[in-house]
Amino acid sequence: MILLDSTVVIDYTRGKDPKLHLLFSSLKLGVCGIVRSEVLTGWRTAADRAKLIAILNGLTQVSTPDSVWDTVGDNLAELRRHGLTVPVPDAVIATLGMNLNIEVWSRDPHFAAMQRILPTLKLFQEPP
């Protein structure tokens, strides 16, 4: 399974990248609660919200164990010690991926920067 960041889900919902449609239909993909929350901030109409919920419900739902939250804080502190400040949701997604030993798929450059400091973070390499 690959854990998705909201950047990928949002790009998929916009429907402008045919490659994403193919990848979403062929890969086992999951989202965690924080990604659901981020994605659901973007709806404008009830129909938009229903479409987003349907897309999110079609993905594997990955829960965040209580034990991960302390590690999120530790990882944020480690990143800051190296001069990198990232949004808390990105640190949650990265830490959850590391905890589950699965790849994270993001289009946000924060993740590559985090990986240089947190080498156990595995990032999905999007095909060209």
What would you call each of these model-derived segments?
Residues 4-7, 32, 85-87, 108, ...:
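Histidine- and aromatic-rich ligand-binding microenvironments
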